[in-house]
Amino acid sequence: VSPTKVGYIIMTSDKAGLERKFEAKQRKRNKPGVVLCGSLEQLRSLAQLTPEINQLYQRHWDEDILLGCILPWRDDALSRIPDDGSKELMMDGRQTSCFVIKFGKPGENIAKALWDTHGKFSFASSANPSGQGNRGLVEGIGERIEARADLIIEANAYVKSIQPNDANKVRYEQGVMVSMVDSEGRLIPQQNGERKITPCPVLIRKGLDVDKIMA
């Protein structure tokens, strides 16, 4: 369990960990998995990107803004997923996942080290019972997750520092998620600054810095 800009997350890198995550959260398995990327190089080696999507990630990386986009996997990246059943648990039926950057220094450092040193993925989910928030406090992750986690990194002060003026009732507990695929999981076409091109990016979930991302 690691702190992020919006709260606490469960991080794991294989099927056993994914199974434990679903069991601990009592969560349904029909949503795209979340893949944490500790570098843009990792992102580009895993996900299919158009020049516009690549530029979007680059801008938010440079501005240190949390961003997650639902994208299809590169064909050559699929073979890097552990052959242990992980694939079925960390992507949806369209073979898409949500690829996330700039989620917070503690987790970013872990994800980068796992990938650069060991070639391991970092799959993630919020560390709270499904449908509930943790309020940015390690005390809010719940007894089930606490009992099943191998390691819990407590950094309530760090989480609070990202949204210091927001009360717990109005603070964001998640990052922005944007779908960059059509109903079949294929990349949307280049938009070229126009509004008539479809399919187009879809804001699936509001979150931290949504005003900056949508500007």
Walk through the language-model features, giving the residues of each.
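Active-site-adjacent structural elements in enzyme catalytic cores
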Residues: 1-215
